[in-house]
Amino acid sequence: MSSLSKPNRQFLSPTTNNQDTGREQTIACARDMVVLYNECLKNHAVSLGGHALDGCGEFTPKSTTILTDPPSLRCDACGCHRNFHRRSPSDGFSQHRSPPSPLQLQPLAPVPNLLLSLSSGFFGPSDQEVKNKFTVERDVRKTAMIKKHKRTKFTAEQKVKMRGFAERAGWKINGWDEKWVREFCSEVGIERKVLKVWIHNNKYFNNGRSRDTTSSMSLNLKL
């Protein structure tokens, strides 16, 4: 009678347990690495009422970064805090997702834009450069608005003389003796282009008025 063979029992060795523990830790680390911090969204021109970014394409932690120390979480490229960088995915990591596969645990490819920035040593304009740019643009806009809204104020006597001159000249100065026109401008104290603009702006308005009012005024023109 043949003897019964004993069942081949297999016990998990400590090495197997360590491998399982390491795999769980790897999956846990991968779950933490799902959240990425991409381009910097800090507005460097907010104090000037504008919008300007520094061009940083991805958050790069410094060598002195400590995860438990929030103030140290600054980008080595642009110097801004990690919270200014766009978080991806924005809705955070879903707890209902299955653990990442081994293919997902591979390191992510670097962002080309960031590599170009690092190789060239340029990380976008500095705060001072952005401030200077917006200051110049603001001054240019302000100067343009002043020139646009600036109106020449005339005295009552100047208006009377210009109205009389315009009526004599047929509400136009082109075609008349240039010397006569300039002598009148010198007498009234205005420039020729100012007189031309005034005649153009008041031509149709004054043609609709009663000429009795104009004729009753003393023109005192030395023509």
UniProtKB/Swiss-Prot annotation:
Disulfide bonds: none
Predominant cellular place of this UniProt entry's protein: nucleus
Superkingdom of the organism of origin: Eukaryota
Region (Disordered): 1-24
Chain positions of site Required for DNA-binding: 199
Subcellular location: Nucleus
Biological role stated in the UniProt entry: Putative transcription factor.
Protein's name in the database: Zinc-finger homeodomain protein 12
Organism name: Arabidopsis thaliana
Higher taxonomy: Eukaryota, Viridiplantae, Streptophyta, Embryophyta, Tracheophyta
Name of the gene encoding the protein in the UniProt record: ZHD12
